[in-house]
Amino acid sequence: MRLAIVRTHPTQYFSPLFKALANVSGLELKVFYLFENRGRGEFDPGFNRNISWDTELLTGYEYEFVTPRPLPFKPKAVFESRCPELIEKLKSGNFDAIFCAGYGLWIDWQVIFFAIRNNIPLFCRPELNDLGVVRRGPRNWLRTRFLNWYFSKVSAFLFIGKLARDGYLSMGGEVSKAFFAPYAVNNELFQLSNFTEEKKNSLKERFGFEKCELVLLYVGRLVPRKGVDLIAQAVTKLRHKIKIGLLIVGDGPERSALESEFDAIGLEKLVFAGFQNQSKLSDYYHAADVLVVPSFVEPWGLVVNEAMASGIPVVASDRVGSAYDLIEPEKTGYIFKAGDSFSLAKKIEQVFEMKQGLGFSRSYIQRKVSNYSIQEAVRGFSAAMKYVSSESS
């Protein structure tokens, strides 16, 4: 089977999947990218700095960059583009199927309509959930009708997790067309071999947390929708009960304000580590006792995968999509109500109580996330391709 994949730009999370797919027997894969320089020294507004990923994103699979053209009524909207060159490449490529992850961009719709018009099987893998969204009225009715139509045209729905599958089925999707292809990271990258408590204590000392009873970790952009200031509100309620250390890995426009806010609390230890590449993250995860993900909007949240691959529990808001797949109370972490600092404080305190008692099982946490792997995603793609091939034969 010849499979075309359309993506906006290379990323450290998707390139490993494409490399793995390129090794599948009987599959000829080609990835089309619209933008070349993102993640290669270009300014990222979310991190508020220039970002260069330190992993090779373009080896191990066939790819080609195509040139998008701005829409005349949105000349400065980078991702709102049309791309006649891409459509020509899809026409001449003689592809058996096309993978277009979502449906939110103009370019997505050019690809979707091209596939439908030419009777080419269409695969999709959207971040489909309604967390934190109240849908009602005519717009919701139109959205429902639209998704009913769209999913009826999709040949294979690759779901990243439970919420995406439930959303697909609620919109009239067929069970037989749904295949599990989870969002995943390279779990092995975060699993330190021969890990011991002595190693953890050594890492804590390295970052200055040796006097802390509980070390919290946040990893990600410092922007409003991530809700990082909620951690400040929560730990203020706990600082007289627990000697808390906080490690923040990431950057963004809110960094200066957050530094001032956390400094005023008087934590046992506070470290802003700035942006770190994925290859450097393992030590930060292993130095921490728990990852906190307080987002107001988070369709999945791959930092949850990274933390659990490292063997540490996660406290995540109920707006984090991966929480509904990966978090088991008292086993892999806790879920709290988004925006509620009292709820977050309670869950952090429960983590501390668990740590004082039997603690969380590192091996259980790692086993839980082991099914959310690149290999499992490849199996999902392979099953979808087998299904589509059998349907068309």
What are these regions (language model features)?
Residues 275-276, 283-288:
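Short alpha-helical donor nucleotide-sugar binding micro-motif in glycosyltransferases
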Residues 313-317:
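Short hydrophobic beta-strand element within catalytic cores of glycosyltransferases
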Residues 328-330, 334-341, 349-356:
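Conserved acidic donor-binding segment of nucleotide-sugar-dependent glycosyltransferases
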